[in-house]
């Protein structure tokens, strides 16, 4: 198939090209040309054409405000909520989603429905349920609660057996829970190592909700290589992360979208904390 009369951005030169034809073959770009070749054609009438976007920090099943989450919710309802959001993402141009904790493993169920041809949604790369310590950041959100290295190992293996592509853990607190701080680790080093060992045995990796430097350094020692948020990241830790080639998803919107948070019904303390953390968060990512 050829998509004709498209407008594309040349990311090398920064120039906008009009009247471009793009060949799609087996779901991939086969050729870009001023003149289409033989085959089916679909005119875009001068619309912009971009590759599918990838969202790497997604919670399709999340409930706003977080305090309204029902951990005993019927999984069918959870999947329907996730389905609607996945469709919204697809309409916005997002064709791949990495989920990093879903209530009732809604990501895995939705991905299975898509494979069966029952759901038109982006490609979903799921973590299933995240794993948290007792009293930790994931409590009340449908996470798996584990205490000690063996419990974390078993929890990770259970999520992997369910079909997860990666494992999500909360290694620090965050800004969503009243009275919670994020400057100290919530998981210990042995628990981190046990989780990484379980993931490595399945040829995959661990992604960590990680707000501050001490916990990130412990996680790096254990072999965790994907991090979310980094609200308070010092220069030495940022340098180490870069040198070791790990990945950071900064989620800057978490501390810079107060109007959206109020619209979604977040508690005022969450909005206030978000405002307070924003300058440090922005400075951390700039490092």
PLM regions: where:
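Active-site gating/metal-coordination segments in enzymes
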Residues: 135-190
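Metal-associated gating/positioning segment near the N- to mid-region
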Residues: 47-118, 135-137, 190, 222
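Short amphipathic alpha-helices and their capping/turn segments at secondary-structure boundaries
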Residues: 39-48, 107-118, 149-164, 233-247, ...
């Amino acid at each position: 198939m050829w998509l004709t009369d498209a407008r594309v951005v040349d990311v090398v030169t920064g120039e906008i090209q009009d009247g471009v034809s793009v060949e799609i073959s087996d779901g991939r770009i086969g050729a870009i040309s001023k003149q289409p070749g033989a085959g089916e054609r679909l005119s875009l009438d001068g619309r912009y054409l971009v590759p599918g976007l990838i969202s790497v920090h997604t919670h399709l099943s999340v409930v706003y405000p977080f305090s309204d989450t029902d951990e005993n919710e019927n999984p069918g309802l959870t999947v329907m909520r996730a389905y609607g959001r996945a469709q919204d993402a697809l309409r916005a141009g997002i064709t791949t989603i990495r989920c990093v904790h879903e209530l009732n493993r809604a990501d895995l169920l939705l991905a299975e429905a898509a494979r069966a041809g029952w759901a038109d949604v982006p490609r979903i790369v799921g973590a299933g349920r995240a794993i948290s310590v007792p009293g930790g950041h994931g409590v009340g959100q449908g996470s798996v609660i584990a205490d000690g290295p063996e419990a974390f190992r078993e929890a990770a293996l259970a999520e992997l057996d369910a079909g997860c592509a990666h494992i999500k853990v909360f290694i620090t607190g965050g800004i969503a829970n009243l009275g919670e701080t994020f400057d100290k680790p919530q998981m210990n080093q042995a628990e981190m190592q046990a989780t990484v060992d379980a993931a490595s045995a399945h040829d995959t990796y661990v992604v960590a909700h990680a707000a501050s430097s001490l916990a990130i350094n412990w996680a790096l020692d254990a072999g965790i290589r994907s991090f979310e948020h980094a609200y308070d990241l010092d220069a030495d830790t940022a340098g180490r992360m870069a040198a070791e080639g790990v990945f950071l998803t900064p989620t800057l919107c978490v501390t810079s979208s107060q109007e959206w948070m109020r619209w979604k019904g977040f508690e005022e303390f969450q909005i206030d904390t978000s405002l307070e953390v924003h300058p440090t968060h922005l400075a951390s990512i700039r490092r």
